[in-house]
From Swiss-Prot:
It is found in: Secreted. Its main location: secreted. The gene is axe1. InterPro entries: AB_hydrolase_fold, CBD_sf, Cellulose-bd_dom_fun, Cutinase/axe. Pathway: Glycan degradation; xylan degradation. Disulfide bonds join 274-291, 285-301. Keywords: Carbohydrate metabolism, Cellulose degradation, Cleavage on pair of basic residues, Disulfide bond, Glycoprotein, Hydrolase, Polysaccharide degradation, Pyrrolidone carboxylic acid, Secreted, Serine esterase, Signal. Residues 244-266 are annotated as: Linker. Degrades acetylated xylans by cleaving acetyl side groups from the hetero-xylan backbone. This is Acetylxylan esterase. Residues 266-302 form the CBM1 domain. Residues 250-269 have a biased composition (Low complexity). The active site is at residue 121.
Length: 302
């Protein structure tokens, strides 16, 4: 299986044969990388895909033509038979690792791309763990280090958490009416080193990120706060982050918020997911790329 370097070498060789002139390898890499890439992570029991994070993911794609996106592949389970009976704790551990691996790997391949994270419920929790560190002892994560590399943290320009079980009142990035905490709350006084990049949405009636009793509230953040989240994301992206219509790589399909995973097409595009436990999308990569295993939960076309 060829590495990214070997693939690049092949591309450079083809370019030289076609033009008769040497080609700058760094230029080729930059042309293949999007200006903005969005990671989405779904809520518990939802089939592989974006789940309810799709609302904000789509808003970013529509606002910034050329933006690409991918959904984190992880169990998103809480012990239910529909998702394989995997415990919530194991799902969070696997999801946190999968999120960190996907983000770190993408940044290594595209160091100049601006990254946006959009997580919903358990999906917010795994991004919270990956970006902020601090461990998650309630779910079995005792290592308090931030699992993202320093470069990847710098590349993450905005993170949107909706219905995050790690919510606790008083965090500087909280938005909404909740004045208590979620069922797996951060400890009092917790400080996230990337606080300025985050907005976390939670209302008082939510039984998961707060202490309410209305599950419908938990599912409504995209509609209630989607435009507000987009405005924050736009403010965080650099002025040169967006590409004009028709410029740069584009997402082959818009994510949907349905309860079933969506397939980007018969073959996956460069940087897209192509495998991992629970993945139901395409496993063949477009010409010039191969499906490389990053973790048990995530493989990528490189």
């Amino acid at each position: 299986m060829p590495s990214v370097k070997e693939t690049l070498t092949l591309l450079l060789s083809q370019a030289f044969l076609a033009t008769g002139s040497p080609v700058d390898g760094e230029t080729v890499v930059k042309r293949q990388c999007p200006a903005i890439h969005v990671f989405g992570a779904r809520e518990t029991t939802v089939s592989q895909g974006y789940g309810s994070s799709a609302t904000v993911v789509n808003l970013v794609i529509q606002a910034h033509p050329g933006t690409t996106s991918e959904a984190i592949v992880y169990p998103a389970c809480g012990g239910q038979a529909s998702c394989g009976g995997i415990s919530y704790a194991n799902s969070v551990v696997n999801g946190t690792n999968a999120a960190a691996a996907a983000i770190n790997n993408f940044h290594n391949s595209c160091p100049d791309t601006q990254l946006v994270l959009v997580g919903y419920s358990q999906g917010a929790q795994i991004f919270d763990n990956a970006l902020c560190g601090g461990g998650d002892p309630g779910e079995g994560i005792t290592n308090t280090a931030v699992p993202l590399t320093a470069g990847a943290v710098s590349a993450v320009k905005a993170a949107i958490f909706m219905g995050d079980p790690r919510n606790i009142h008083g965090l500087p990035y909280n938005v909404g009416t909740c004045t208590t905490q979620g069922f797996d709350a951060r400890p009092a006084g917790f400080v996230c080193p990337s606080a300025s990049k985050i907005k976390s949405y939670c209302d008082a009636a939510d039984p998961y990120c707060c202490t309410g009793n209305d599950p419908n509230v938990h599912q409504g953040y995209g509609q209630e706060y989607g435009q507000q989240a987009l405005a924050f994301i736009n403010s965080q992206l650099s002025s040169g982050g967006s590409q004009p219509p028709g410029g740069g790589p584009t997402s082959t399909s818009r994510p949907t918020s349905t309860r079933t995973g969506s397939s980007p097409g018969p073959t996956q595009t460069h940087w897209g997911q192509c495998g991992g436990q629970g993945w139901t999308g395409p496993t063949q990569c477009e010409s010039g790329t191969t499906c490389q295993v990053i973790s048990q939960w995530y493989s990528q076309c490189l």
